[in-house]
A protein has these predicted regions:
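Conserved beta-strand/loop scaffold segments within soluble protein domains that form the structured core
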Residues: 1-238, 242-245, 259-291
Length: 291
């Protein structure tokens, strides 16, 4: 299909195996633009895991402008994994909108490892109480690649939570943006919102622009945000070299450890294994175990 996917999960249904949405782009000798739209409806007390991948099979320029809408009904659970590891000729603008009802849990993990320009716009709207929204991501890029993460969590009603944790590793002349926004409305008392963005610049020519934002109109909330930008711990790297670990492998291990907090929350073993392999490939080393 070239128009996206429609996924409907009925009430009280738990889908045993993950559903995959794989976007293949082919072309002859011309640049290609595609605009898929995915609609995912998960009814009350239903549970589903979804994996989305983008893959270009052409050497010509490709632009994908995608929209995904997820509606999670009362007590629904959705785990969504985005794997972005495309060629340098491919660019992606990914727009995801999620509406949650009471007692629902939705997690979105975004793994950005390739492509020319990637922009992830991720928007959560909490329309009920006791909702949990989880946003996590890992970015590892090099060359002149660019990745944007723009997130929004809109707390509209009381007694809800959101958790954001994004890690970035930038090499060569790569650039990145993290713009995370949390809005807590006046009625959304007892909100618990956490936002953290940590970045490592492997090259002194790499750039990351980070802007965590909180807009709080309620007075009984627990909200925090933070951002760090730095380089690998030279002391830790020296310590590893003193114990016989080559510098290249030592750097890889430090980066694995840096990203591990995001990988820990991946619930599908095959996805976790694949992401581990992608990280190792991006770092250019072979590590004989998973962290």
């Amino acid at each position: 299909a070239n128009e996206g996917a429609y996924i409907y999960i009925p009430k009280n249904v738990e889908v045993e195996k993950p559903i995959q949405i794989i976007n293949f782009t082919t072309g002859n000798d011309v640049a290609t633009m595609i605009q898929p739209r995915n609609l995912i409806v998960v009814e009350e007390n239903a549970h589903v895991q979804i994996i989305e991948r983008h893959q270009s099979l052409t050497d010509n320029a490709v632009l994908t402008n995608s929209v995904t809408e997820i509606f999670a009904a009362k007590s629904a659970t959705v785990d969504f994994y985005k794997i972005q590891n495309d060629k340098d000729n491919a660019s992606l603008v990914d727009n995801t909108y999620i509406e949650q009802k009471s007692n629902s849990v939705v997690s979105v993990h975004t793994f950005s490892f390739g492509g020319n320009i990637t922009r992830n716009n991720l928007n959560f709207y909490q329309r009920g109480e006791h909702i949990d929204s989880i946003l996590k991501g890992i970015t590892i890029i090099e060359g002149k690649q660019h990745v944007d993460h723009h997130t929004l969590v809109h707390h509209i009603e009381p007694n809800c939570e959101s958790h954001q944790d994004y890690k970035g590793i930038f090499d060569a002349r790569s650039t990145g943006v993290f713009n995370g926004k949390v809005i807590v409305e006046k009625e959304a008392q007892k909100t618990n919102a956490y936002q953290q963005n940590n970045n490592v610049l492997v090259s002194d020519k790499a750039t990351i622009n980070a802007k965590p934002q909180l807009e709080i109109f309620a007075d009984d909330v627990k909200c925090s945000h933070g951002c760090t930008i730095g380089q690998l711990d030279s002391d830790a790297l020296f310590y590893m070299q003193q114990r016989g670990i080559p510098k290249k492998e030592g750097k890889a291990l430090l980066m694995y450890a840096f990203a591990n907090t995001v990988l820990e929350s991946v619930k599908i073993p095959e996805v976790k294994q694949r992401i581990n392999k992608l990280i190792a490939a991006k770092l250019g080393v072979h590590i004989g175990f998973d962290l």
